[in-house]
Amino acid sequence: METFTDVLLVTANVGSLFDNVSRMTIQSYKPQFIALHFQEVGGKDYMLNMGHAEDFFWTLESSEEMKDFDRSCIYVDNQFKVEDTFTALGSMYFIHKTLKNIQQYDFHVKNFKAVLEKNRYMGSLDRVTTVEKEKFPKNFWPDFKWSRKGFMRTRWIIHNQGLDLVNVHLFHDASNLIACNSSPSIYSANRNNALRYVINSRQTVLPFFLFGDFNFRLDTLSLVQDLSTAADVQTVKKDSSNEVQRIIYEEKDNDHQVLLRIEEKLFAYLHQAVFREDNGRALLKYDKEVAAFHDVIREEDIMFPPSYPYSEEHAKPTQYMNTRCPAWCDRILMSHTAQDLIHRVSLSWTSLSSDFSRKLRLLQINQHTGC
């Protein structure tokens, strides 16, 4: 008789959020293995907030909802003073007391070992042998400020099924004006190179799941062109240079109402409901970045609205900020073999969306021989 293990995968960019994560999800789905991938641990002011971030991780681990998870592995890269390696990534893995057959890979001795207790690792993680962590090199984007972007990898055997779980944080769009200059944008090209690097760095044929903040954006130039077909365009440049400061699109009728205003960190569209109606399905045709990886990566159907940039105000959890064009930045991607795995057990792959860009997936892994 086959044994099934319920696995919950969660990715959350916690740059401005340190509250309870998915209590109702844990209670409702009762997973046996939980993988939480966090990005921007400590937030933008990480030098001041890292202590609060650490408290958040320990509070979550000791919460009432986690009492039946008797083993865990927690990795937090909090060494912001080590600029060459700091990624601000955090990965937490919780194992339920009913799950017996689980092992983790030691990348130093190149062997799997049973997980028997709660393990916490906080620091640069350079000497921790059960995790691989890397900050993307400066030459990945020489024309832009070097930021705390990178990836963190762990490897597991769950009921004789081996798999990699990779926490990823790719580069963002620094300027809306630059993003809509070309299709694809220069930022998209940078993300493409970095993600290909992550995939090619794996030294195994095991199935893998990549989940984190990919910062994938819509094809902004194509989207803006389609949104503004019946609008007049006004370009405003800085007095001291020929540099574009803002682009304003006004409706040709309706008293020339401003339809769309774009600045470096402003994307204010009049009809914001289009990003939420029918989970933003009409915008999926502009979501093109993942298509470049279809040779090695698959993704289940997106059944939630764009995950970014939700308001950071707790009273406005479903409202988008006017800072960026909404997009599906937070994703859970998988290798072809990983998708075959979840489809082979005829599972119902649950796609959930909650506030503040958290993306959750529930899957089942069945027991069979071999990795």
Where do the language-model regions lie?
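Short helix-loop capping/hinge motifs at secondary-structure junctions, enriched
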Residues: 99-104, 339-340
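Charged/polar interaction segments and conserved charged motifs
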Residues: 107, 111-119, 142-144, 148-157
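N-terminal, active-site-proximal structural segment of metallo-dependent hydrolase catalytic domains
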Residues: 1-92, 101-102, 121-142, 152, ...
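Hydrophobic, aliphatic-enriched repeat segments that assemble into extended interaction scaffolds
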Residues: 32-40, 87-89, 93-96, 204-225
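Core residues of folded domains in eukaryotic genome-function proteins
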Residues: 3-10, 30-37, 88-90, 103, ...
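Catalytic lobes of large eukaryotic enzymes
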Residues: 65-76, 129-141, 145, 158, ...
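Active-site beta-strand termini and strand-to-loop segments that position acidic
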Residues: 94-97, 154-159, 335-336
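Amphipathic alpha-helical scaffolding segments
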Residues: 25-28, 32-33, 51-61, 108-120, ...
